[in-house]
Amino acid sequence: MLPAPGNGSIHLMPDKKKRHVFDKGHRRKFLVVVDETPECESALAFAASRANRTNGALALLYVVEPGDFQHWLGVEEIAREEGINKARAVFRLFGRKLKSMGFEKLDAEEIIREGKIDEEIVKIIEEDEDIAIMVLGASKDPSGPGPLVTALAAGKMVGEFPIPITIVPGDLGQDEIKDIA
């Protein structure tokens, strides 16, 4: 988790950059962190519907988190390659899902990062000034909405996150999502 500012702690939230989504040559991107959870499909459906209706695009982010193998160089490299291959497989899966939802012509940038997920999300938002909205899916699990929703939308970062976060309830069907997006 990111430390709170002040009292000698490191403040990881950089100054917010101006978004350029309406400038000539730019268009709004909806950021979706992709994984294999059911709620991710809800986020994808909402983001794709919004991007399609507003002439936007998708930025699909997969983060390969570091393992505990850093002292075993060969094992770390194998784990890294497996993570990248898994990311590519997830992108293929979500490409098929977008096509089945009728969004095959929607621009979807595929981004693979290595590191801690919350830090990589902030980095990609700061690097790409066209990313204007992050879309997360909330889990239907009674234990909570999921670790990413909890960390980003209800955690210490929420008041200073660089862009708005849209949270899609996990119990909405794709038709309901398309209707409200």
Name each model-derived stretch.
Residues 4, 8, 15-20, 62-89, ...:
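Acidic, proline/glycine-rich short linear motifs
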Residues 75-79, 127-128, 152:
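Short, hinge-like loop/turn segments at secondary-structure boundaries
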Residues 59-61, 109-113, 166-168:
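General small-molecule cofactor/ligand-binding pocket signal
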Residues 48, 123, 155:
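Active-site phosphate/pyrophosphate- and oxyanion-stabilizing loops and adjacent acidic/basic residues
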Residues 20-74, 160, 181:
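Small/aliphatic-rich secondary-structure junction motif
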Residues 2-25, 99-134, 172-176, 181:
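Structural beta-alpha unit
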